[in-house]
Amino acid sequence: MDKITYAYLETTNYCNLDCSFCNRTDVIGSLKHMSLEDWGKLLDGIKHHPIEEAKLMGMGEPMLHPQFDEVCRMFKETFPKCKLIVATNCQYNVNDKFRECMKYIDMLYFSIDGYKESYERDRSPAKWKKLIKFLDQFKSVDRYNCDVVVNYVVNAYNVDDIEKIDTLRKENNLSQLRLNIAQIWDENKSLQDDIATSGYTTEQLDYLKNTWGDNIMGKSKWNYNDCFWVNNAIYTTVEGHVKMCCMNTGAEPFGNLFENSIDEIRQMTDYQNVKKGCQTNKPTSHCKNCSYKELIPILEYVGV
């Protein structure tokens, strides 16, 4: 069996925002913070895998977990050599818990999609003033060598704001601007169903290619048999459910880590069918609207 080297682990599904490209309200169950006891059990269940990179995020704002500093500490205690990545929406005040988290996080994404009006539109009910306050507070935070970057989800309505956010990044001594072309995380919908994810003009695409090509994440040379999720990754929800990837958060889980081992779940028939479908470039219905596959023409155009 292939070893897991990448983990995407959700420890809370609480969130203070309702972002336009997030299907959170359609897929989450009851609001929940994972207990430290369950978190310890989950880590024990996957610690035999050589995980090299992990993201502690999902359908919630990670920093809303009341013990997220302990969550991070426990993870790094279990996987001391693993690169730990966390994304945050910056819509809260920096506190001691946040400062403690910085000791364990290797890369921190500040999610900033758009400038002022477009930011508040796409990340409602986020407030621009609250973001600026957070950035001001962050200036006094010890980063402990954490690489702090800006993660920007690009859509057809915020392309013109990229330069403004890059200026904001520089003003706040953040190391990188990461541009992610917006995706749809729903297996029943396509990028073509939303003008914001498909309605780019040629001028916009040329601008992205010529000005920001080096900042755009992803790769255009990709087919289903290149999918690393089915071979070397794990995606878990706050309940312990195992799903295939973060591109299809609405899918039925293959199993639960608190009921079966991760190795047992990965051997189950439904899991293996999805895996074999990708490996043979004959995807099952699970992957029929893979938003990453749908992105390929755009990524090719912008030269990624």
Segments the model singles out, each with a brief description of its role:
Residues 1-21, 51-57, 231-240:
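N-terminal pre-triad scaffold of radical SAM enzymes
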Residues 10, 29-34, 44, 69, ...:
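Radical SAM enzyme [4Fe-4S]-AdoMet core and its adjacent flexible, acidic
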Residues 14-17, 24-27, 36-114:
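Conserved SAM/AdoMet-binding glycine-rich loop
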Residues 16-24, 244-247, 284-294:
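Local cysteine-cluster metal-coordination motifs and their immediate loop/turn environment
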Residues 60, 153, 293:
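Short donor-sugar binding/catalytic loops of nucleotide-sugar-dependent glycosyltransferases
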